[in-house]
Amino acid sequence: AALVGMGSSIFHPESSRVARMASGGRHGLAQSIFQVGGNMGSAAGPLLAARLILPHGQRSIAWVSLLALLAMVILTGVGRWYRHQHQQPKKDTLQTDTHLPRGYVIRTLLVLVALMFSKFIYMASISSYLIFYLMHRFGIDTQAAQYHLFYFLFSVALGTLLGGPIGDRIGRRQVIWVSILGITPFTLALPYVGLDASVALTMITGFMLASAFPAMVVYGQELIPGKVGTISGLFFGIAFGLGGIGAAVIGQLADLWGIEAVYKLCSFLPLIGLLAFFLPELHKQKYLPH
């Protein structure tokens, strides 16, 4: 598990840089395409558990390792392309510094971190505990709950795929604002509705929340130009860390208070999206003095 974690920590920042290099200027679209691969893999997990592992046992997981071998072959080709790009003579590029004061940049990063806290803690409450919530509240079996989790994770993948290009078109700040604060009515309603409505609401929230992350990553890269790897590593590290810590804390609270009470508490997290008001429009701030 430690080796998998180390591999992931190396892979994601550098791959985010590769995606930006290959974007042709459509940075949000490239970031979405890069991220959606992981989301589709996460979505396939519950489906594989329901259709493969539960009927045939844990040994059937070995067949899934063939996909990892295929990914290694593909990454070999990507690595060759990346090396070739570095060997090319660098062209003169326009200065892309946003000219924002250092303190302003730090405050903006802190706002983004707070928004990521809201997003990933709430996502952890759904992705890690939706199965138990549905089984406890509605009495459905494990296999049916796995399918409902798949619907949520598929919506997350779809939101990731569309969030980047939408940000390219209408602005990343707008996507971040709407995708986090805009889900508040749905999260507040979730603990009080029936099974079908619960599934529908989790799909809507998954789609909207996921659309924020590609926009956040590219926004951060544009906030501090020339530090693509640093920003990518920071954001992916925070995302994975918050997801893991959030899942552990939510589990402890669920043991103390019950899963339904925890879902009611988590339903207020998207209100942190109000902080998106303090995110600057970078193109409007481009020529501010240091």
What spans do the regions from the language model cover?
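Flexible cytoplasmic inter-helical loops of multi-pass small-molecule transporters
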Residues: 77-101, 286-290
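A late C-terminal transmembrane helix in Major Facilitator Superfamily
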Residues: 225-257
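Small-residue (Gly/Pro/Ala) motifs that create kinks and tight helix-helix packing interfaces
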Residues: 41-53, 131, 246-254
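Extracytoplasmic gate region of multi-pass secondary transporters
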Residues: 107-153, 157
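Cytoplasmic helix-loop-helix junction between adjacent transmembrane helices
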Residues: 1-37
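Helix-to-loop junctions at the C-terminal end of transmembrane segments
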Residues: 160-171, 254-255
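Helix-loop-helix hairpin linking two adjacent transmembrane segments in secondary transporters
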Residues: 34-83
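Structural signature of the two symmetry-related core transmembrane helices
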Residues: 174-188
